[in-house]
């Protein structure tokens, strides 16, 4: 073999070696700079379960969502970045059109706060909740955890004790509003966030008002607000009047005798019942204010913030009776006279009987 031939051979071997050495890197860089194929923003939810936190499952998910055409390229980038269940952060992500594959993986990577670098928060709202079960159901629709997991957290006696609540009182912890949190936030973390919101809500000013109206704890105020709202959910102008009425009864040692409290005892059994009877009212139940003295052990509803403030700013008057007006206004007649209350109640019953008869 001539010297020239040897030189050509050596050059060829070196070239092949360099190509073999550089090809994986060239292949990676080509893949890393490829871009997503979606033409509009795509929301991706990566579950917390370990089996979902791997390259192949995520690649399949993105392909199904129309984000990828070249699954192999996406998997190659993930492998090169050593992505796995230990550093992939579950949660909600938004993939914008034309996002480089390397940037997608960088977004999924867990940071020091244990969130993904590009993880998005979600807005969580809950209103019109009659019970903790209702609340858990609403949360299940907006967050990763199911209602059973939330209920288990709500019933954790050690945690409730740490926060200073009984199970009956804990509905007062949850202030209806819209909050920002991560989709994969666990029930325990949700409760911790609500505890902070509760502390922020109960300012020194509100605590002073609480004492001024004769109540001792925020739970009592929310419990009374839940009764007020259950009596009147449409006309906010009546909230401070009704609150003042019940506070008068508490101060005078008169049972609250609120129909919504005994209805609460029956759960869904009275759903659709238009005329409440004595047999319904006579149920033995710690929430039935026809049977017990003072407030029930906890809220019968998660009342809006405005009703809680109406309790704290209750109207001063001498009313101790209220009765629905005999019309469709949804408002009430208030009085301090037992005789006048009987007249108001009779007028309402006559009107209701006539309306039911005409249907």
Segment roles from a protein language model:
Residues 17-23, 68-70, 97-99, 151-158, ...:
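Short linear motifs at secondary-structure transitions and domain/linker junctions
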Residues 26-201:
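Signal peptide-directed extracytoplasmic domains
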Residues 4-8, 51-57, 140, 271, ...:
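A broad, low-specificity signal for short, low-complexity segments enriched in glycine/proline
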Residues 1-10, 45-51, 57, 64-68, ...:
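Intrinsic structural disorder
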Residues 125, 144-145, 159-359:
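Bacterial extracytoplasmic/cell-wall-associated proteins, especially those involved in peptidoglycan
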């Amino acid at each position: 073999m001539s010297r020239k031939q040897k030189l050509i051979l050596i050059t060829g071997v070196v070239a092949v070696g360099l190509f073999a050495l550089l090809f994986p890197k060239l292949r990676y860089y080509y893949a890393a700079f490829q871009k997503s194929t979606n033409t509009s923003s795509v929301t991706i939810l990566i579950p917390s379960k370990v089996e979902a936190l791997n390259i192949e499952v995520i690649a399949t998910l993105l392909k199904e969502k129309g984000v990828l055409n070249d699954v192999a390229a996406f998997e190659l980038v993930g492998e090169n970045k050593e992505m796995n269940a230990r550093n992939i952060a579950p949660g909600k992500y938004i993939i914008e059109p034309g996002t480089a594959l390397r940037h997608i993986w960088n977004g999924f990577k867990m940071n020091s706060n244990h969130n993904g670098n590009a993880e998005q928060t979600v807005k969580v709202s809950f209103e019109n909740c009659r019970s903790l079960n209702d609340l858990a159901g609403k949360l299940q629709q907006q967050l990763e955890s199911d209602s059973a997991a939330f209920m288990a957290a709500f019933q954790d006696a050690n945690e409730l004790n740490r926060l200073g609540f009984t199970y009956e009182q804990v509905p007062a912890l949850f202030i209806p509003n819209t909050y920002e949190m991560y989709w994969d936030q666990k029930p325990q973390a949700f409760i911790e966030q609500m505890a902070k919101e509760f502390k922020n809500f109960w300012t020194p000013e509100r605590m002073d008002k609480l004492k001024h109206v004769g109540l001792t704890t925020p739970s009592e105020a929310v419990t009374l607000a839940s009764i007020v709202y259950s009596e009147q959910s449409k006309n906010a102008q009546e909230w401070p009047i009704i609150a003042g009425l019940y506070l008068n009864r508490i101060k005078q040692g008169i049972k609250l005798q609120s129909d919504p409290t005994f209805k609460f005892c029956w759960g869904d059994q009275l759903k659709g019942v238009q005329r409440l009877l004595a047999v319904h009212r006579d149920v033995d139940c710690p929430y039935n204010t026809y049977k017990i003295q003072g407030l029930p052990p906890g809220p019968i509803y998660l009342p809006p913030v405005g009703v809680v403030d109406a309790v704290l700013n209750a109207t001063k008057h001498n009313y101790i009776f209220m009765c629905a007006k005999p019309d469709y206004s949804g408002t009430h007649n208030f009085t301090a006279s037992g005789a006048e209350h009987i007249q108001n109640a009779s007028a309402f019953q006559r009107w209701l009987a006539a309306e039911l008869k005409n249907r």
